[in-house]
A protein has these predicted regions:
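Helix-to-loop junctions at the C-terminal end of transmembrane segments
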Residues: 125-138, 222
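Helix-loop-helix hairpin linking two adjacent transmembrane segments in secondary transporters
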Residues: 6-45
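Juxtamembrane intracellular "pre-TM" segments in multi-pass secondary transporters
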Residues: 49-77
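Short amphipathic helix-loop junctions that connect adjacent transmembrane helices
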Residues: 91-110
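Symmetry-related core transmembrane helices of the 12-TM Major Facilitator Superfamily/SLC fold
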Residues: 29-46, 229-246
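Intracellular juxtamembrane helix-capping segments at the cytosolic ends
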Residues: 178-191
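Structural signature of the two symmetry-related core transmembrane helices
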Residues: 140-155
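A late C-terminal transmembrane helix in Major Facilitator Superfamily
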Residues: 194-223
């Protein structure tokens, strides 16, 4: 909701402002980010209200969820591979822009910042324009998002000009704007109310897992051939899309 929109708004403004600041020096965005972190910390200390005291509910034994729980396993598979692919691509995107367009370091920061802003704007637009207007199940949203992401990776692999790179970034942002919330809400809806804390931990670990493996693979593949990370991710997402198509969304039973 509002928190997700705020995150996407930051994703739009941050790269755009960072690209402008990089025109001063490449270290300027880092100094400004440090200053913003300090301002945020002061705001939290002096202005953020205390959380209301929760009424004590009857204690229920917390249930540990396994990654292999059949209710959430499909979402765990999708989440881990999805975030691995995204991390693999994001690790090499700035190099891709620099190599394809023949840019200097400063020009790369400015151009890539603009592209990241466009990607975040597309993510926000897909959430506001689609997810909040149409009531579809998480798997249906994943079925829409996966082809968009597959097309984005193909565009990144084939790109030989700035326009195709920007199109790829917009597609990637729109696809992840649908896939990310669908993955998290799908895992949450698959379990009971008293298991929400456990499933949040399990599902939340898919992102760090993907971003642990993905960058290592991205750098390795990029050294071999610059378009290889994107073709590899393209190849990973094809069976992932087939897997999503093969799953029949199940309605959660109410007790």
């Amino acid at each position: 909701g509002a928190v997700g929109a705020a995150n996407n708004l930051g994703g739009i403004l941050g790269p755009a402002i960072g690209g402008l600041l990089a025109g001063i020096t490449l270290l300027t965005p880092l100094w400004v980010a440090s200053g913003l972190a300090l301002v945020t910390a002061l705001f939290v200390i002096f202005f953020l209200p205390d959380s209301p005291t929760a009424t004590k509910a009857p204690e229920t034994k917390s249930k540990n969820l396994s990654y292999f729980d059949p209710r959430i396993l499909p979402f765990i598979i999708v989440g881990a591979l999805m975030f691995m692919g995204m991390a693999l691509v994001q690790q090499t995107l700035a190099f891709r822009f620099q190599d394809v367009l023949g840019l200097t370091a400063v020009e790369t920061a400015q151009t890539f910042g603009l592209a990241m802003g466009c990607s975040a704007a597309a993510s926000l637009a897909s959430q506001i324009g689609l997810m909040q207007r149409f009531d579809l199940s998480p798997f249906h949203w994943l079925r829409i998002a996966m082809p968009i992401l597959i097309l984005a990776f193909a565009c990144l692999a084939l790109a030989d000009n700035q326009y195709l790179l920007l199109v790829a970034m917009v597609l990637q942002g729109a696809g992840m704007g649908l896939a990310g919330p669908a993955f998290m809400s799908g895992a949450s809806m698959a379990v009971e109310a008293h298991e929400q804390g456990a499933v949040a931990g399990v599902a939340g670990s898919c992102g760090p897992l993907g971003f642990t493996i993905g960058p290592l693979l991205g750098g390795f593949f990029y050294q071999i051939q610059p378009d290889l990370p994107y073709w590899f991710t393209f190849a990973v997402y094809l069976p992932l899309f087939a897997f999503v198509l093969s799953k029949t969304p199940k309605k959660k039973t109410q007790s």
